[in-house]
Amino acid sequence: IVETVPRRDHVVPVRYRDGRDWHQVLTAAGPDRVSGGQWEEAYAREYFRCVTGEGMLVWLFRDVRKGTWFLHGWWD
C-alpha cells in the first residue's frame, strides 16, 4: 500500500507499507517512465527512488495501467 500526493502529471509516494510497518518518504526522485509491449502485453511503469525517514533508499514503482504500487528494491 502506498499513499500519494498529486503533482502536475503524476502522483508522488509520501508513505508506503512494507508488511505491517509504515515508512515515511522524505524525498522522491522521479518518475522514471518505462513502457513497451509491441510484441507482448503492453505495460507502463513509473519508478521512484525514495529516501525514507529511517534513512533507507528504496525503489518504488507504480503500474500505470492498473494503478498498483510495488516495492521494487532497496539499497543498503
Locate predicted features.
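Non-catalytic peripheral regions of nucleotide-handling enzymes
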Residues: 1-76
